[in-house]
Amino acid sequence: MTSYSSMFETTFSSLRKVWQGVTDSVGGGEKLPQIHESLSDEDIELIRTFMHACLEAKGGAVSARLRAAQLGQMYLALNDEGRKRFLQLLARDFAVNRDLIYELASELHQTQDDVGYLDIEQRLRTALVSPRMRLLQQFNALPQGVKFLVDLRADLLSYLDDDPLLASLDREFIHLLEAWFDIGFLELRHITWDSPAALLEKLIAYEAVHQISSWEELRNRLESDRRCYAFFHPNMPDEPLIFVEVALVSDIADNVQNVLNKDLPSTSPEKASTAIFYSISNSQKGLRGINFGNFLIKKVATTLSHEFPNLKTFATLSPIPNFHKWLDKLLLEEGYEDWDEPTQLALLNAAQKFECAPHLSTLLKHPRWFEDPDLTNVLQKPLLQLCSRYLHEKRADDRPRDAVARFHLGNGARVERLNWLANTAEKGLEESCGIMVNYLYDLQEVEKNHEAFVTEGVIASSQEVKNLLKAAQKTTKRKPILPRLMPQKE
């Protein structure tokens, strides 16, 4: 199946052809400089000169469009190192003119004349738009130019850790993209099996939560009791920005295997009372940090309510991506005391059965540990309690540690229920020991929950989840919540 990376390169390949057509249509213009794909120091000078020519905007709109297309073609011909050097050049040499800004700010402070004040204010506003942003905005006029910029930022994000200078370029980039991708510009579309094959292929490539391994599997996710919705931008009409997959069922789902099981018969959507959002995938890496998800879920919930008035409950079946990693750290730091003999016996028997070291962290990494009923009975209660504790833990900014929790709680949902062994696929076991969580979207409460979360850091949760949290806190105060695996005696 097509991967995200191969889809990404396919997009860049098509851009090369499109923009070659742009340059051909206006007579080719200046011949492109011959540059090495890694950008040598001499090549950097050529690119810098070409960027300045783009900014001078000589020859009117047609010439500007041509030069932007040529610059884009040069970028697309670069390898990873060359693209990084290109972006470093943009960040370093095409930032705002600080001296000019200081000068204008001083004039603004000193002027007493209203007309003069407005004139200086406008000049300052113009000066605050960096040359690099004016350069990037030129791509907006090109065919697929917006998609190019989104993918350009995806490249930029991959280099941020290596060069702090690029962070300022990224901040400006976000500001630009936020304006272009305002929610008012976006279109919500219902994707079905009859949608274009190229679009369906992108769903397979971009699915980030539960991998789609075949066309048959995709078809199952688009059956009559399923829905898939995506946001699109008018300048990227064939590219989903974010999409959500929904199951129309009779109750809040507690097991993703059943949701994804293509052998189970479909149900009549008219009889469903519950909509389960079981997968939300951001399709464009270059739009990271621009939040469409909260609008998407609320928009889809409203759309479904109109189509199926019998739907009363809207909830997710969500992953808990870093719970297992957090648990490993906890096991390492907090230590354990022995529990009762039956508990120890179940743990030791499981260690023997799976031929692994007698340590809980090791046992939980065994791919089949969940198939031992004695072991799962022993671990269910303490792991669910610890998972509740994890979901309520906060970072220094008073926001939940878990990214998925931050997203849904920020949208006004509440932590409704934790589900034991809800995802026994390899990824589910690696990320969260198979546990999944339902976030409930009570449409009458979401605004109140959102406000309490944003202003006071309040995490809305059901009584069931609160009880798990209290039990975890009480048990942890008395003694460690998880038993220690003891080595067998000789």
Residue ranges of each PLM-predicted region?
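Extended, composition-driven regions rather than compact fold-specific motifs
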Residues: M1-I290, N294-E490
